[in-house]
């Protein structure tokens, strides 16, 4: 299946409202888990694990579920660290995608990384090494904010 076909079949394409999503900057031993998208949107781009909030879920429940589905890891979401907006328009200027993403600072609790079909790669990286990767916009800022928040809570 091509990326264009994947996007055409995605109900989040050409939405009537923004799509709410969560992500997690998960830290273990000073490193953060970075994943690479294996399908559209943003195929091949490095980002944080996460996904859509389902009806009736709290944000915390959603991020725990999404991380477990994508990576098999158990996490403790600690606190929201801002928000991100991703709006993509087609050649005619129509909104093709609109995501509002709420990232959490999170602690690793347990498990070994096992990726689902949405991801092609995962790696625990030093936050200072993210600049060499092609990442989603603002990823380094989210990771820095999450690291600072977790460090402040340890004091």
Show where each model-derived region lies.
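A generic structural micro-feature
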Residues: 14-18, 45, 94-100, 119
């Amino acid at each position: 299946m091509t990326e264009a076909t994947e996007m055409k079949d995605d109900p989040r394409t050409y939405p009537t409202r923004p799509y709410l999503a969560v992500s997690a900057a998960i830290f273990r031993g000073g490193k953060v888990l970075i994943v690479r998208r294996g399908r559209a949107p943003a195929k091949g781009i490095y980002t944080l694990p996460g996904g859509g909030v389902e009806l009736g879920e709290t944000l915390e429940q959603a991020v725990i579920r999404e991380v477990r589905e994508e990576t098999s890891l158990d996490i403790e979401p600690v606190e929201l660290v801002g928000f991100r907006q991703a709006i993509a328009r087609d050649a005619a200027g129509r909104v093709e995608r609109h995501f509002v993403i709420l990232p959490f600072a999170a602690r690793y609790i347990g498990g070994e990384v096992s990726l689902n079909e949405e991801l092609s790669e995962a790696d625990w990286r030093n936050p200072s090494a993210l600049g060499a990767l092609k990442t989603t916009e603002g990823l380094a800022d989210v990771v820095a904010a999450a690291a600072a928040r977790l460090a402040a809570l340890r004091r």
